[in-house]
Amino acid sequence: MDTVLQTLAERLVDADATVRRLAVIDLPYSEEDDIVPLLLPRLIDEDAQVRTEAIRALEGFEEPHVVQALAPMLLDLDPGVRKAAGEVLSELKEPQSAGPLLPLLLQGPPEVRALALHAVRALRSPEAFGPAMQSLRDPDASVRREAVGVLGYLKDPAAIGELAEVAANDPEVEVRRIAVGALGYASTVSVLPALTRALTDSGWMVRDEAAQTLGKLRLSLAIPDLVRAMQDDYWQVRVKAARSLGLLKAEAGLPSLVASLTHTISNLRKEAVIALGEIGDTRAIAPLEAALADPDPDVRKIARLALASIVLAQKAKAEGAGS
């Protein structure tokens, strides 16, 4: 062991917690290739700040024994330690790393369960499906929110019914919103009732998510509902509805999209122009020409592109009919 590393090793066991904490912070910047053996003992240091820094220093190390040591840190008595553990564990990339976290999905206080669910989400571990489904009925909103996130990542059709129920009835707006977004992985129209119902949710963010998800799924049966959403009290919802009407090439949306070209919010005017270009109906030419005088330069630019798109589409259509 070289002199620098020897000094760090001595500082790691110093009687002064501040010295130990600074040694932990310095360790990743040393030239030592394998710092894990020096860091792991500091996970059980008597000082919470030392434990916290040791956790942070272990970020990016995904060997099984490291994950096995980090997972129990979610149960630490110190909230700062638990938070750091949750952040580091949520950066895991390998599916097999979910193993040590699975037992924590249904045990411990709500904060621990929520952190564990968040950590396994991106790992897409099939073993997390059952605990996540069970957690949809947890009394704690943060646990339910993370459970919905896990199911959204897993994309298992068996969860669609439960997610639709959560989207409609969970008492927390954010949980309902995430559930609506999670329904976006469905490949059938079975989610249509849940999504159209969500367009009338009391929370505007839920309605916003529903309008976007309907376009993502290209559910043309939702066009009448999206047209109604163009009258939503929140312009953010109208923006998503306009975007989806464009993706669906919904001619039924022309009147509401044209009306939006004079809205005070430029973002809505932009989306309306884009949607009219995507729909490609010649009835939109005159309103789009008027949009060339819009005070927002982006709206004017997009209007020119939309007009060019409609003209080219009509030309191609005419040439196709004549051949």
List the model feature ranges, each with a label.
Residues 7-30:
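Alpha-helical segment of the N-proximal tetratricopeptide repeat
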Residues 21-26, 48-60, 83-87, 118:
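Non-membrane alpha-helical segments in proteins
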Residues 231-305:
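Ankyrin-repeat and related helical/solenoid repeat scaffolds used for protein-protein interactions
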Residues 1-11, 32-44, 63-75, 94-106, ...:
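Amphipathic alpha-helical scaffolding segments comprising HEAT/armadillo-like alpha-solenoid repeats
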Residues 15-16, 46-47, 77-78, 108-109, ...:
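Short inter-helical turns and helix N-cap capping residues of alpha-solenoid HEAT/ARM repeat scaffolds
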Residues 26, 57, 88-91, 119-122, ...:
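Core register positions within helices of long alpha-helical scaffolds
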